[in-house]
């Protein structure tokens, strides 16, 4: 039995972020839709060829998306909210962009659909909206067209389709409540149609993604799998594909499904391979996700080989990536500034494709034939264990010395609140922003020129100072109560801190997609983390010197820095988070000693870090909360600690959020129409809260009445004296004109409420 190899998906953005640049040019009206479509086509062809050149046998087709793959599935099924439809009912690319962004070059603007995290990653998807009794039709040909493209180029094609159960699971009911699983019967005929058309094109295998199978599913959702796949069987071979965790808890359901194979994630999951093998029908393909699609580390192929060789010849096997390579940067060969030692530890998407191919080749050869080649390939990752760049004795000693008192503020919130009110004397409904202001071309050019050595430190600091002054002046003109310095010096809220920590390295081109055209370049944690010197104090004190109003110090929290970095794999996430927390603790202390009275420690990734299985939640929340408190508890009573969270469902982690003991929490609520506040109301959240009053991911400017309406909803759940007024998130991706207009309306709404409540 020959062992085949494949990938579950490939990054779509392009090595130089060509997709991002083309999307944004199109949205700005600088290129035509035809030009945008041409960029997409060129990227797909390039990416298929890169995988084929690396030795990948079965190429994923359908992993390309103009925004995200869930939204692509919504279009495929004709599931478009009425407010985003064209008047003639047809779907086009602008329809897709209106759903995602609230506006597009054509069509009427309307509120964007909600966006949330893709499982426990830092990737996002647009949440499908469902209404009772709605119908579905095959309305979007993108997948079928792309299959034709790949076939025409001579590739061995494996289409990728998001499965019906996971699609329904990821969506949300809009309007009167009903069981969205009841829509399954309406959706299945469209899936049947798609599979039929793929069969007619000569497709043998379809990768049907059902990552919901790694979750704790209600019994009715578990049972729905049999119904769904009974309807879908018989046209093409189906590879039921799971990732991000194990599936042993649903093995009894899976083994009885009428599919032809199963893909499991052996990097994130703890499944016992022999148990899975014994349970599955012997003629099924078992696809083993042994090359980690979510990190940048080279695989120890010797270990991976030993992990799977026992199954060789016992059943049909495929070797693959654990998940889509979407979560990995594209090509390590583009990194020319990493030193040779560190570079030898890494593998990006292209290199991971080669790992998949090499491992499959070794498994297909007589046992032992590739031992030397695998050992040679894996040698750097083994040598790393002894590198002095990885281990720091001082950090280890400081971690060892942490005690329970280090995580507790001096006084409880009620006492701190009195001290802080006396210090700041804010009005009711105090207004603020979340931290960043528009990152203009000018700001980005200054940072790039400094990075490339085209300007010196003096010129750089003068330029950044001017932008900070502009941000302070703008906020004073608008009448905001608590100001921020605008973060002109920061390229990214995690990378900026990583650049000032020891234990990190940075890539030139290690971009990964976060959502739509938004890309991030996560830093890589290669060793123990420490802070050699203050990071934010200079800019914070400069900004504070420009105004009598308080200026917030802005830090990214330990859990978010961890979640939005590529972490080490040789120590626990808890250890990394606490190392970061100790570094931030020193920064908090330096800020307050420098006269900064309000310090925001952002933790937008707190929920994202949750394990996918609920029985593992508490252990994670315990150390995540401990890490935050360790970073913040050095603050004096009169220092007000804020935190910010976004894209969150809070109901099930309210105790942990309250346990953070931040004086003020700001959250993203506008897209969900303040629904998230129900959690705070039912829990009787004791501290202050700033529910986001407008969606910064959309360029639409909210009017005063809209904001007042949202704040009245908020006030029906939280007493006015504990409410703050702020946008959903930072404003770095917005333009100044829409930012001014939106903040002016926000301040006006707060003033109106002060006079009318």
Swiss-Prot record:
5-methyltetrahydropteroyltri-L-glutamate binds at residues 17-20, 117, 518-519, 564, 608. It is an enzyme of class 2 (transferase). Its EC number is 2.1.1.14. The active site is at 697 (proton donor). InterPro entries: Cbl-indep_Met_Synth_N, Cobalamin-indep_Met_synthase, Met_Synth_C/arc, UROD/MetE-like_sf. Keywords: Amino-acid biosynthesis, Metal-binding, Methionine biosynthesis, Methyltransferase, Repeat, Transferase, Zinc. Its cofactor is Zn(2+). It catalyses: 5-methyltetrahydropteroyltri-L-glutamate + L-homocysteine = tetrahydropteroyltri-L-glutamate + L-methionine. L-homocysteine binds at residues 434-436, 487, 602. GO terms for biological process: methionine biosynthetic process; methylation. L-methionine binds at residues 434-436, 487, 602. Pathway: Amino-acid biosynthesis; L-methionine biosynthesis via de novo pathway; L-methionine from L-homocysteine (MetE route): step 1/1. The keyword Metal-binding applies. CDD domains: CIMS_C_terminal_like (cd03311), CIMS_N_terminal_like (cd03312). GO terms for molecular function: 5-methyltetrahydropteroyltriglutamate-homocysteine S-methyltransferase activity; zinc ion binding. Belongs to the vitamin-B12 independent methionine synthase family. Catalyzes the transfer of a methyl group from 5-methyltetrahydrofolate to homocysteine resulting in methionine formation. This is 5-methyltetrahydropteroyltriglutamate--homocysteine methyltransferase.
């Amino acid at each position: 039995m020959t062992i085949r190899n494949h990938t579950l998906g490939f990054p779509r953005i392009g090595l130089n972020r060509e997709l991002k640049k083309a999307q944004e040019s199109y949205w700005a009206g600088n290129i035509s839709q035809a030009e945008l479509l041409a960029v997409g086509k060129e990227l797909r062809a390039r990416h298929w060829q890169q995988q084929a050149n690396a030795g990948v046998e079965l190429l994923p087709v359908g992993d390309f998306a103009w925004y995200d793959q869930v939204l692509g599935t919504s279009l495929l099924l004709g599931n478009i909210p009425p407010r985003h439809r064209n008047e003639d009912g047809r779907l086009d690319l602008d329809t897709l962009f209106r759903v995602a962004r609230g506006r597009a070059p054509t069509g009427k603007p309307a509120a964007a659909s909600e966006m949330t995290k893709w499982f426990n990653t830092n990737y996002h998807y647009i949440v499908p909206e469902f209404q009772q009794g709605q119908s579905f039709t095959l309305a979007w040909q993108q997948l079928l067209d792309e299959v034709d493209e790949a076939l025409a180029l001579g590739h061995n094609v494996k289409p990728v389709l998001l499965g019906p159960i996971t699609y329904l699971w990821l969506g949300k009911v809009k309007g009167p409540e009903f069981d969205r699983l009841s829509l399954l019967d309406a959706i299945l005929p469209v899936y049947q149609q798609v599979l039929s058309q793929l069969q007619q094109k000569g497709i043998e295998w379809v990768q049907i993604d059902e990552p919901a199978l790694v979750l704790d599913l209600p019994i009715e959702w578990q049972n729905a799998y049999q119904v769904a796949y009974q309807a879908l069987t018989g046209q093409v071979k189906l590879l039921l594909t799971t990732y991000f965790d194990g599936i042993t808890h649903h093995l009894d359901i899976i083994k009885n499904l009428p599919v032809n194979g199963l893909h499991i994630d052996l990097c994130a999951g703890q499944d016992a391979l022999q148990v899975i093998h014994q349970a599955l029908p012997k003629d099924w393909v078992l696809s083993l996700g042994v090359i980690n699609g979510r990190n940048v580390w080279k695989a120890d192929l010797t270990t991976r080989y030993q992990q799977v060789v026992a199954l060789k010849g016992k059943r049909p096997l495929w070797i693959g990536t654990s998940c889509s390579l979407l979560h990995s940067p594209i090509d390590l060969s583009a990194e020319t500034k990493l030193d040779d030692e560190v570079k030898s530890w890494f593998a990006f998407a292209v290199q991971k494709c080669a790992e998949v191919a090499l491992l499959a080749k070794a498994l297909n050869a007589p046992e032992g034939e590739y031992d030397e080649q695998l050992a040679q390939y894996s040698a750097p990752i083994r040598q790393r264990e002894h590198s002095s760049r990885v281990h720091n004795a001082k950090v280890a000693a400081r971690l060892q010395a942490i005690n329970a008192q280090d995580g507790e503020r001096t006084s409880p919130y009620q006492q701190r609140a009195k001290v802080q009110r006396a210090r700041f004397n804010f009005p009711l409904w105090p207004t603020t922003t979340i931290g960043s202001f528009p990152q203009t071309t000018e700001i980005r050019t200054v940072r790039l020129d400094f990075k490339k050595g085209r300007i010196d430190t003096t010129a750089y600091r003068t330029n950044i100072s001017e932008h900070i002054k502009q941000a302070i002046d703008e906020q004073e003109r608008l009448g905001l109560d608590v100001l921020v310095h605008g973060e002109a010096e920061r390229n990214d809220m995690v990378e900026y801190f990583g650049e000032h920590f020891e234990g990190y390295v940075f890539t030139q081109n290690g971009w990964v997609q976060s959502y739509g055209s938004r890309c991030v370049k996560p830093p890589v944690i290669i060793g123990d983390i420490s802070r050699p010197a203050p990071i934010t104090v200079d800019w914070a004190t400069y900004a504070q010197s420009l105004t009598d109003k308080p200026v917030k110090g802005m830090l990214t929290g330990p859990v978010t820095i961890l979640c939005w970095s590529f972490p080490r794999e040789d120590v626990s996430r808890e250890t990394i988070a606490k190392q970061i927390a100790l570094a931030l603790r020193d920064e908090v202390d330096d800020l307050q000693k420098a006269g900064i009275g309000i310090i925001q420690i952002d933790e937008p990734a707190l929920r994202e870090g949750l394990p996918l299985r609920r029985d593992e939640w508490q252990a994670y929340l315990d150390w995540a909360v401990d890490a935050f408190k360790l970073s913040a508890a050095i603050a004096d009573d009169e220092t007000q600690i804020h935190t910010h969270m976004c894209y969150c469902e809070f109901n099930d982690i309210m105790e942990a959020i309250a346990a953070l003991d931040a004086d003020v929490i700001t959250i993203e609520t506008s897209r969900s129409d303040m629904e998230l506040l129900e959690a705070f109301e039912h829990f009787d959240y004791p501290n202050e809260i700033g529910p986001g009053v407008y969606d910064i991911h959309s360029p639409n400017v909210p009017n005063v009445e809209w904001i007042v309406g949202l704040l009245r909803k908020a006030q029906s759940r939280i007493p006015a004296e504990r409410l703050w007024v702020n946008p959903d998130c930072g404003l770095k991706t917005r333009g100044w004109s829409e930012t001014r207009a939106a903040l002016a309306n926000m301040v006006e709404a707060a003033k109106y409420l002060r006079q009318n409540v």
